[in-house]
Amino acid sequence: MVDYNLGCTVRLDDEETLALLARLYEDGAIRHIQVQAVPLPRRLFRERLGRIAASGIPVVVHAPHHGHGVNPCAPAAYDDRPLAVIKAYIEEAMSRTLEAADTLGAETIVLHAGRYEPGGRFTAVEAFADFLDHHNDPRLTLENLPAVYAGYPLLGNTAKELAALAGTRITRFCLDFPHLACTANYRRLSFVDELEQFEGLNVALHHLSNIRCGSITDEHLELDHPDGGLDLAAVFARLRRHAAVPATLEYKEDSANVYARQVEVFAGLWAE
């Protein structure tokens, strides 16, 4: 058994990647999976949950985010659906997320505060507080987001901002390394200094992939990507200091093929 708690991400409907991750788990190469609770028809949702539960792999659940139509801090931003439809959709999505966590025995539910329209940060902060008032679960774990993506701002980019958003409602946090690097590049901050600020938070999960050197855009690149610019020395120094905190790899394209190799890359970086 490896001396770190590494995991990989899989969508609820991605059976090919789940099969690969089950083999990696059986081999002892990973110790958990992060399940993206993407919206699915009810029957398919229950069927997929059953298959994941049957794998016996410990699970972290990732709640749907704005890419799935769930945008807590500004539900109607960048969305032309009627507001009543949006709100009903979010309620159903969060209900399914809690159901997934219950079924899979997940102790962690990763949450994004969301994106908002330029100039709307104050309103977004208030809306997110309202969201937490209506969705109060001790498993909710707030993740830091890049400062911007595709031209729109996102809420909760630094340790200080996450703490302010969480207030007393959320006590657990997810540190996403490439998101923090994108924020540091965009705001011209020191990545190492911003990383240090997370020592004051109760970080329950790490997210890891790579970004291009100097980039402000989160691309979920491989750890050994030739254009990678993430400060891996600083990242792995923190991972070793907090070896008991799970670290989840997150990739988007060709996941089944990418994860098999990236688990090995991670092991090599850890050994170094």
Q: What residue ranges belong to the model's regions?
A:
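N-terminal pre-domain/capping segments
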Residues: 1-88, 92-95, 172, 272
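Acidic (Asp/Glu)-rich catalytic clusters
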Residues: 21-28, 42-68, 95-105, 126-137, ...
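Active-site glycine- and acidic-residue-rich loops that bind
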Residues: 37-43, 115-125, 148-159, 179-192, ...
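Gly/Pro-rich active-site loop or hairpin
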Residues: 70-91, 152-156, 179-244, 253
